[in-house]
Amino acid sequence: MAVTKLVLVRHGESQWNNENRFTGWYDVDLSEKGRSEAKAAGQLLKDEGFAFDFAYTSVLKRAIHTLWSVLDELDQAWLPVEKSWKLNERHYGALQGLNKAETAEKYGDEQVKQWRRGFAITPPELTRDDERFPGHDPRYASLSDKELPQTESLALTIERVVPYWTETILPRIKSGERVIVAAHGNSLRALVKYLDNMGEDEILELNIPTGVPLVYEFDENFKPIKRYYLGNADEIAAKAAAVANQGKAK
């Protein structure tokens, strides 16, 4: 029996990743490095013989453009794609746009680590009259007041990501289709926590690098049996460590 696989990829480096700023739902594009990372991710998948039947991504351009680059490298630009806000990055509330290192200097490394990586801790809320509040963005016009976040913890992110997985993505995988998901550091952490049944302390230390394909293999009951990155292990570890260090004071 063929092994069922799922590919997850965090978007390539964004302009605000490069500037070390909290991004959340702000719709910033890829940096030049990020575009190269996305292209390299597609090449890795091509080299390993991957091809897909369906793709999912968020409604934020850094993930969308990453997916486009990956599919272009695979010569699968025609692939059907579903975009959903439920795969968006975690909403960082009033931290969105702030420099992470400067915020750590003000509040301390541990507080910023908890805001970035803690399970149930939410950053300070946005007010609804703040221009950064998603209720002002037409792409979210169909969302209810309850669905429009003013801030999110990882726990709250899980509340939207996991139902989307179980109700939308997983049934397609069960039908035999080969699926790729291009999303964000925290929406993917939310999914990884669920798939691997990670504890809160364990997920605190998980950092997903930009632009590196993460492959899951499932058994006949669609339970994960293996998770691994494609690419050079030392380079991937260095990229993950760099993600962890973004929230530390200089």
From Swiss-Prot:
How does it associate, per the subunit comment?
Answer: Homodimer.
Q: Which Pfam families match?
A: His_Phos_1
The record's family statement is: Belongs to the phosphoglycerate mutase family. BPG-dependent PGAM subfamily.
GO BP annotation list: gluconeogenesis; glycolytic process
Q: Which PANTHER family match?
A: PHOSPHOGLYCERATE MUTASE
Q: Does the keyword Isomerase apply?
A: yes
What's its catalytic activity? (2R)-2-phosphoglycerate = (2R)-3-phosphoglycerate
Instruction: Specify which residues bind substrate according to the UniProt entry for this protein.
Output: 10-17, 23-24, 62, 89-92, 100, 116-117, 185-186
Q: What is this protein called?
A: 2,3-bisphosphoglycerate-dependent phosphoglycerate mutase
The UniProt entry, under InterPro entries, shows: His_Pase_superF_clade-1 (IPR013078), His_PPase_superfam (IPR029033), PG/BPGM_mutase_AS (IPR001345), Phosphogly_mut1 (IPR005952)
The record's SUPFAM superfamilies line, in alphabetical order, gives:
Phosphoglycerate mutase-like
Q: What is its EC number?
A: 5.4.2.11
What high-level taxonomic lineage is stated for the organism? Answer: Bacteria, Pseudomonadati, Pseudomonadota, Gammaproteobacteria, Enterobacterales
Q: Which SMART domains match?
A: PGAM
Task: Name the Gene3D superfamilies on file.
Answer: Phosphoglycerate mutase-like
Q: Which molecular function terms from Gene Ontology are attached? A: phosphoglycerate mutase activity
Q: Which pathway does UniProt place it in?
A: Carbohydrate degradation; glycolysis; pyruvate from D-glyceraldehyde 3-phosphate: step 3/5
Q: Give the matching HAMAP family.
A: PGAM_GpmA
Write the record's keywords in alphabetical order, separated by commas. Gluconeogenesis, Glycolysis, Isomerase
User: Into which EC class is this enzyme placed?
Assistant: isomerase
Mind telling me which PROSITE patterns this protein's record contains? Answer: PG_MUTASE
